């Protein structure tokens, strides 16, 4: 505390608020990047789910369509939130206890609400997507014979015969797919990846805290007060709160 620090090496001199902003910005940019990263993983999950149904020869079933649509919805909504966060970016930051304030110089910061919405939405879906893969695959991913049994001349021909699910697909491709999906669903690495995808960038509860802390809930209450004929209502409250209404043309 008593050491001499040259002024050119002083970054903060009593502006303690920037310390909190630094932590918030780290999380914010991480969550923004997640809104691009996780949709890309969603593309892999979607392709895996579609192939699992095809290998099992159930790809025309209605429940498969529903599951694929669910993955697409989550993927594209997460991407849309990240894209919107970029489009609504401004040189401003949310400062606890103060609200959104100009922050620079010149760095455009993605919109906090949409960063958190995209991260929370796609993060919460991680284990649901794993459940869909497990459901479409069946138990074969956990019980599939070892590869050495397929090259064994005594057991190989019978294994190829009895593990064939779709007559329109080469059985060798089917076997290779189940090994691939087994690595995703049944391996230690697969489990670690799922936990990382769920908590990376901040657990969902952290996004929920950020969203409800920073979102202008009061303006929505004022609008409903106006609609309901209560005192303290404001028909224009929501228009004042929407981020795109305050953008510079």
Language-model segments: residues:
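Short, charged, amphipathic alpha-helical segments
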Residues: 65-69, 102-105, 109-116
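Glycine-rich beta->alpha junctions and the first turn(s) of the following alpha-helix
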Residues: 1-76
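Long, contiguous internal "core" modules enriched in hydrophobic/ aromatic residues
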Residues: 43-44, 56, 80, 97, ...
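Acidic/histidine-rich catalytic neighborhood
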Residues: 88-106
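Loop-to-helix element that buttresses phosphate recognition and phosphoryl-transfer chemistry
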Residues: 69-91
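Alpha-helix capping/hinge segments and adjacent helical runs
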Residues: 113-248
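A structural signal for well-ordered alpha-helices, especially hydrophobic packing surfaces
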Residues: 53, 75, 79-82, 126, ...
């Amino acid at each position: 505390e008593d050491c001499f620090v040259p002024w050119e090496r002083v970054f903060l001199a009593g502006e303690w608020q920037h310390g909190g902003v630094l932590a918030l910005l780290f999380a914010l940019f991480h969550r923004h990047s997640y809104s691009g990263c996780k949709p890309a993983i969603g593309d892999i999950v979607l392709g895996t789910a579609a192939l699992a149904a095809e290998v099992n020869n159930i790809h025309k079933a209605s429940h498969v369509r529903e599951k694929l649509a669910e993955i697409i919805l989550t993927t594209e909504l997460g991407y849309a939130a990240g894209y919107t966060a970029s489009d609504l970016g401004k040189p401003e930051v949310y400062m606890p206890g103060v609200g959104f304030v100009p922050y620079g110089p010149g760095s455009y910061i993605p919109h906090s609400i949409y960063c958190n919405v995209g991260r929370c939405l796609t993060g919460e879906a991680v284990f649901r997507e794993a459940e869909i893969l497990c459901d479409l695959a069946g138990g074969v991913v956990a019980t599939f014979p070892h590869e050495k049994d397929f090259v064994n001349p005594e057991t190989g021909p019978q294994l190829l015969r009895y593990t064939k699910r779709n007559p329109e697909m080469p059985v060798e491709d089917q076997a290779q797919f189940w090994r691939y999906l087994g690595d995703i669903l049944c391996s230690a690495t697969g489990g670690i990846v799922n936990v990382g995808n769920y908590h990376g960038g901040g657990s969902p509860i952290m996004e929920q805290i950020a969203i409800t802390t920073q979102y202008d809930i009061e303006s929505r209450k004022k609008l409903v007060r106006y609609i309901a004929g209560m005192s303290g209502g404001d028909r224009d409250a929501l228009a004042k709160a929407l981020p795109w209404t305050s953008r510079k043309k």
